[in-house]
């Protein structure tokens, strides 16, 4: 008995010693890489290769793995890169075959599979990560771009930029429940923490469309800054953050009142700015990806034209610091307790 207790204590203390604290995994679109940034000191502690044009990333429920969707550049991408966050290495490339232009991605609750959009094939694809293969695909007939996964993992909502629509897809039964036109360019989307509302950002019409998450009936329209790209609820459901690429700001929207109450701004240095895949947009640092901490205290905004992230205190809505990334950061993932290598 004593031997077992000692062994257990050693295992526990060993796992505690191996913990390295919270970190971010950031995709750098223009250099086909992923950076791990320690939140303790803001330092990049590892950079790993991924496929061409990585846009979105998903962290496994246990925090040990990340999967990047390789959208591609001039040539359409058709792969996912699996990253081992403990060893800080890319360990596998999963070939998606004909399911090209993978973009939005999320882990399913089983911790073994991810769901990813294939924009070019018009499908939602379920991928078996441990076995490195496509499990099955659901034809949607829509060029799905970004997606939001329901908490129970049974449905996803996709924003279909090219057709100006959003779709609700039933993963259990492998079918599209409904598709509705919301405007001319919905991209970012998120579901309220209570699961009742879907918010979709239309980058062409500069507005948020609020929909009933179950019926996709339109409930409201909220004006935003120019070229809204991402939309995310805070964990308590009180606030919604919207990144406006052309305006160079992030709107803070009161979810209940359905109106913007603040606008977060960022430092911009034209001598340091680079042209992104979207070109140059005046004096905008081009805020794109948004990541909100699980406790709702901080948010990180990817400033793609400046090759850095802005860490924002959500209580004061002020930038606390800037974190250096690779070239053209966008998709991000949060790791609560990064394991030491």
Label each PLM-derived region with a short phrase:
Residues 1-6:
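Bacterial N-terminal signal peptides that target proteins for export
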